Regions:
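Functionally critical loop-and-helix segments that line ligand-binding/catalytic clefts
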Residues: 1, 119-169
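Substrate-binding cleft of extracellular glycoside hydrolase catalytic domains
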Residues: 2-99
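Aromatic-lined carbohydrate-recognition surfaces of secreted/lumenal glycan-active proteins
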Residues: 98-112
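Extracytoplasmic/secreted cell-surface and envelope-processing proteins
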Residues: 13-17, 42-47, 77-82, 110-120, ...
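Residues that line or immediately flank small-molecule/substrate-binding pockets and catalytic motifs
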Residues: 8, 105, 135
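Histidine (H) residue identity feature
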Residues: 37-40, 103, 142, 152
Length: 169
């Protein structure tokens, strides 16, 4: 493990009460810290508001502007005008000084995927390398199996399971 992605905020009404401790503990352990925001925005203005809320949370944690900031976009209500709203979120994040940005979503939400499903997100507007993609091809899969598949190899990251354990000494 080289780093962690800590949930800081959700919509404009939730702050992770454990985030400060999680960030501190990760830094003490020598891990790289990234942060994510769980989005609910349905308009450009809401996207900008959520970006401001996320940045305020990051500043409270003293996260540097170079921190990888993740827009977790998977709520069904966000699908209308999703591309324009995601762009508004990105623009506001950059305006506030945070430009190391990616989006987390399910493979089925992307227009470019291996599922033969046309998702609402136009990857060409953002670049496939700016997506952390969740797709679970098998109920159980080990890291070595996932690495041999090379699924989503051009994306920022591929999440191949929702279950996992960390080995300890």
């Amino acid at each position: 493990v080289k780093g962690v992605v800590v949930k800081l905020s959700e919509a404009t009404s939730y702050l992770n009460p454990y985030a400060e401790m999680q960030v501190k503990n990760a830094l003490v352990a020598g891990l790289k810290v990234s942060a994510y925001h769980y989005s609910h925005f349905t308009s450009k203005e809401e996207a900008r508001e959520e970006a401001r809320y996320f940045v305020a949370a990051a500043k409270r944690m003293n996260l540097p502007k170079s921190t990888l900031m993740v827009n977790d976009i998977e709520e069904y209500v966000t699908r209308n005008n999703i591309n324009e709203n995601m762009k508004a979120w990105e623009d506001e994040m950059r305006k506030l000084g945070f430009s190391n940005l990616i989006h987390y979503t399910a493979a089925s939400w992307l227009d470019n995927n291996s599922l033969r499903i046309l998702g609402p997100i136009e990857t060409g507007k953002f670049g496939i390398s700016n997506f952390w993609i969740a797709q679970y091809p098998y109920d159980t899969m080990h890291v070595t199996q996932a690495m041999s598949m090379s699924l989503h190899s051009s994306s920022a990251a591929w999440q191949f399971t929702s279950k996992g354990t960390l080995l300890t000494n």
